[in-house]
């Protein structure tokens, strides 16, 4: 059902419902899937950019299309990047003087969690950790390492669990934490 009664909303809802119905009919006898879940129907939201709100010149370094799109919505310049993790940090280093805020997204931690692949999730976190010294050499005011949600391997799904949060800054007071953990 459309969320509003505008002609545009009714037309979109009708089209989407027709597409879902056709796909469901086509998949009717398939053993692995019987329908499709479509999401993300909306207009580009009008929200203030990071430049307007915080006077930043932000850049996003991400491969996954959803995160690239979200970055654009909040006014970040989305930088081209290769497919390897090292590419993320190479771009950060080469573009560091051109921006004053960077969002660097490592997708595989989430993907391995959804696959239930603990060994590879651990490896990708450890591999990411090895790039921290490269970031520190750039001498940023702040480094934050966290996740947008938890994806425990045991659940193979996003969850309500807390995210570890690491903040390093010469302007922040240290705490007593000695490890980066969800506990």
Question: Where do the model's predicted regions map?
Answer:
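Feature captures the catalytic ectodomains and active-site-proximal regions of enzymes
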Residues: 1-183
């Amino acid at each position: 059902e459309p969320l509003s009664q505008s002609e545009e909303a009714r037309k979109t809802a009708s089209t989407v419902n027709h597409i879902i119905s056709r796909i469901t009919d086509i998949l009717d006898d398939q053993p692995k899937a019987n329908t499709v879940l479509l999401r993300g129907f909306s207009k580009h939201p009008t929200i203030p950019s990071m430049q307007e709100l915080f006077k930043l010149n932000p850049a996003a370094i991400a491969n996954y299309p959803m995160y690239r799109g979200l970055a654009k919505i909040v006014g970040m310049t989305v930088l081209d990047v290769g497919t390897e993790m090292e590419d993320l940090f190479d771009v950060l280093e080469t573009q560091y003087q051109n921006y004053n805020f960077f969002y660097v997204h490592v997708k595989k931690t989430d993907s391995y969690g959804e696959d239930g692949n603990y060994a590879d999730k651990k490896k990708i976190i450890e591999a990411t950790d090895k790039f921290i010294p490269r970031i520190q050499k750039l001498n940023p005011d702040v480094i934050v390492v966290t996740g947008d949600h938890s994806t425990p391997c045991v659940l193979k799904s996003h969850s309500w669990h807390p995210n570890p949060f690491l903040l390093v800054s010469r302007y922040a007071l240290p705490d007593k934490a000695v490890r980066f953990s969800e506990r």
